[in-house]
From Swiss-Prot:
<dbReference type="InterPro" id="IPR020590">
    <property type="entry name" value="Guanylate_kinase_CS"/>
</dbReference>
<feature type="domain" description="Guanylate kinase-like">
    <location>
        <begin position="6"/>
        <end position="192"/>
    </location>
</feature>
<keyword id="KW-0963">Cytoplasm</keyword>
<keyword id="KW-0067">ATP-binding</keyword>
<dbReference type="InterPro" id="IPR008144">
    <property type="entry name" value="Guanylate_kin-like_dom"/>
</dbReference>
<dbReference type="GO" id="GO:0005524">
    <property type="term" value="F:ATP binding"/>
</dbReference>
<feature type="binding site">
    <location>
        <begin position="13"/>
        <end position="20"/>
    </location>
    <ligand>
        <name>ATP</name>
    </ligand>
</feature>
<protein>
    <recommendedName>
        <fullName>Guanylate kinase</fullName>
        <ecNumber>2.7.4.8</ecNumber>
    </recommendedName>
</protein>
<keyword id="KW-0808">Transferase</keyword>
<dbReference type="GO" id="GO:0005829">
    <property type="term" value="C:cytosol"/>
</dbReference>
<comment type="function">
    <text>Essential for recycling GMP and indirectly, cGMP.</text>
</comment>
<keyword id="KW-0547">Nucleotide-binding</keyword>
<comment type="similarity">
    <text>Belongs to the guanylate kinase family.</text>
</comment>
<dbReference type="InterPro" id="IPR027417">
    <property type="entry name" value="P-loop_NTPase"/>
</dbReference>
<keyword id="KW-0418">Kinase</keyword>
<dbReference type="InterPro" id="IPR008145">
    <property type="entry name" value="GK/Ca_channel_bsu"/>
</dbReference>
<dbReference type="InterPro" id="IPR017665">
    <property type="entry name" value="Guanylate_kinase"/>
</dbReference>
Amino acid sequence: MNKKKKSIVIFTGPSGVGKGTVEQLVFNYDELNLSLSCSATTRSPRGGETNGIHYYFISKEEFKDRIKNKKFLEHSFHFDNYYGTLYSELDNIIARNKVPFLEIETNGAKIIAQKMQKLKNPPYNLITIFLSPPSITDIYKRIKNRGTENAQTIKNRVNKAKEELLEAGNFKYVVYNDRPERAAQEIREILHKELDID
């Protein structure tokens, strides 16, 4: 079977590291044939976010029902909300001969990697990429400049980011986001190698 068809890109890093910015640049490289996997969440949409594009915004009751029915590859609870990757989303992307690109929280990425390691014949080739910030100060500034969180939430996110940075070594690739364009180019090179793109 084609290696590219079975591959899944797991893109993670702390809140405020600039994943969204770098991701947009990576998606400009058409030859990578990526398709963003839309996660489900119970949090409220931020300005400009659309259901089914940025996230599937669902109730906590519906989310818990899907957990019970084993509809998630992974799910986690943080910042008072659930987040998860639906098997159906991955299946739909792979059926279109695209490579699923999951931008997910660090703990969710670890759960997927651990789950695949336990399997004798894992169904996916995982390409795990951790985006690292220049400094914690940069994380603080980015989150504050969003203008969507209060002071306590910002503090919580920065503290969580410090914890997540300790996990960077658990991922196959660590990309330093000193400049988004450079980080995106490095990810492009990683994916060319991993997906056997000439």
